[in-house]
Amino acid sequence: TPNKFSLYFSAPADSLPVLKGLNFDEKDAFVIEKTFRNDTIHYWIRDSLLYQQDTLTLSLNYLYTDTLNQLVPRTDTLRLAAKKVKKEEPKKKKKKDDEPEPTKFLSVNTHAPSSMDVFDYITMTFEEPVARFDSAAIHLRQKVDTIWTDVPFELEHDSLDVRRYNLYYDWEPGGEYEFAVDSTAFHGIYGLFTDKIKQAFKVRQIAEYG
């Protein structure tokens, strides 16, 4: 995508490479998504004025394995050219022209299986980093007798995956729960917001583990 670039290294590293913008200010310019080994790094460009530039020029300082198999510092200059995407011709509408365009939402992959493991937790992985969210718009309910009752939970930003949030709760074996998120609860860094989410599930009984 034009608002992201990625670096791939053949070996793990203890630290991230040092990146300096040569035709832009690199300070607070990126949301950095990296693997635990720092061998794959994605740089999400925050500012539309930056990723709409034809070319971004930057210097990259990192550790390089030389011919003696020793790690030595190396600096490269990179020129990142934005890929030109050909715009598709708008398709002719079969319906009335005054119908509104469908809303494009921020895509999210929710892990809340219908049969939840007693030691598992709910995860939400977004297609882009999240800029902000409304915690009051996130709900976890437990079915007590026939009544859905709100229960407290912990929501944490994943320490390794910048696009993932984890919801923790001490599940009651055999309990029935409903996870719900109101529309517009999460806003991505490029302006999209999420649609509403609602998923019901049941926690496995201890006896099911043999």
Residue ranges and their predicted role:
Residues 1-210:
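N-terminal targeting or signal-anchor segments and their processing/structural boundaries
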